[in-house]
């Protein structure tokens, strides 16, 4: 899963 793509501004 790519969480960074869903929330790149974390």
UniProtKB/Swiss-Prot annotation:
Keywords on record: Amidation, Neuropeptide, Secreted
Alphabetical list of Pfam families matching this protein: Periviscerokin (PF08259)
Family: Belongs to the periviscerokinin family.
GO CC annotation terms, alphabetical: extracellular region
Main function: Mediates visceral muscle contractile activity (myotropic activity).
Species of the source: Polyspilota aeruginosa (Madagascan marbled praying mantis)
Protein name (database record): Periviscerokinin-2
Main location class: secreted
A GO BP annotation: neuropeptide signaling pathway
Localization of this protein: Secreted
Signal peptide annotation: none
Domain of life where this protein originates: Eukaryota
Positions where Leucine amide occurs in the chain: 10
């Amino acid at each position: 899963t790519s969480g960074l793509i869903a929330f790149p501004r974390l």
